[in-house]
């Protein structure tokens, strides 16, 4: 952590009322950023970044601290134990990802099933796909009450911000089967959301996000099932 701090700092960006992005500059690891969801029933830290210093701790405390931490999938577990200890907050992970936890700690609490309500505004949804316990977060009060979905890279926002994509392995470009894509879409279907935040700054679908995910899934399934045309 000290070595990382010698050339890096964390930055905070207001994404919308009640939602703050936290990322590291220059980019570290794969450049992901965390999101702090601020609710009257306590703040939820979604996903984790590796670097944590005193300035970051103080800035988060000014925003109301952290009542719980939850992480989309194992690639973002990184320094979750340090974050948990700094804020005396539990880390809630899906039990299907237990085997991927490299640093067991008393702060880690595993949940099972398809959904977990963290409070009246925030619900975790197990989608699977990228990992067996890959999870997204639904924030009902987000986007002015139209609903927000935080997805990490379970649902990956592509460059045009009008579509999303899905992968079993991003570094190796291994796709998911159609059945897994249908499972992801089915898992989020009961939840209303107009905006979607992926795992990186700027990877955001600002409006009509639910429709964007549906048409993205349809496009993806067509692409992996249809025989490509000769060119």
PLM features: what roles do these ranges have?
Residues 27-68, 105-107, 112-114:
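Pre-active-site segment of Zn-dependent metallo-hydrolases
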Residues 13-16, 37-40, 61-64, 143, ...:
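Flexible, charged surface loops at secondary-structure boundaries
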Residues 53-93:
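Active-site metal-binding motif and surrounding structural segment of the metallo-beta-lactamase
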Residues 1-41, 211, 230-231:
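Zn-dependent metallo-beta-lactamase
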Residues 25-32, 95-96, 101-106, 112-114, ...:
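Active-site-proximal loop/helix segment associated with metal-binding centers of metalloenzymes
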Residues 4-18, 42-52, 58, 67, 81-132, 174-193, ...:
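Metallo-beta-lactamase
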Residues 74, 96, 201:
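Short, ordered loop/turn segments at secondary-structure junctions
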């Amino acid at each position: 952590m000290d070595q990382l701090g010698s050339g890096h700092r964390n930055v905070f960006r207001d994404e919308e009322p009640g939602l703050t992005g936290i990322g590291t500059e220059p980019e570290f690891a794969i450049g992901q950023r965390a999101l702090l969801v601020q609710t009257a029933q306590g703040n939820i830290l979604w996903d984790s970044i590796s670097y944590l210093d005193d300035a970051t701790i103080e800035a988060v405390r000014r925003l109301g601290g952290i009542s719980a931490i939850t992480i989309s999938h194992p690639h973002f577990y990184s320094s979750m134990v340090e974050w948990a200890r700094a804020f005396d907050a539990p880390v809630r992970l899906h039990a299907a990802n237990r085997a991927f936890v490299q640093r067991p700690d008393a702060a880690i609490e595993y949940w099972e099933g398809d959904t977990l309500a963290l409070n009246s505004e925030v619900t975790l949804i197990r989608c699977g796909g990228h990992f067996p316990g890959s999870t997204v977060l639904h924030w009902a009060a987000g986007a002015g009450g139209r609903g927000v979905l935080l997805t990490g890279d379970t649902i990956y926002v592509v460059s045009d911000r009008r579509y999303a994509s899905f992968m079993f392995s991003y570094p190796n470009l291994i796709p998911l089967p159609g059945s897994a894509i249908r499972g992801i879409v089915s898992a989020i279907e009961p939840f209303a959301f107009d905006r979607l935040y992926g795992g990186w700054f700027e990877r955001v679908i600002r409006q009509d996000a639910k429709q964007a995910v549906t048409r993205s899934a349809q496009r993806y399934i067509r692409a992996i099932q249809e025989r490509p045309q000769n060119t």
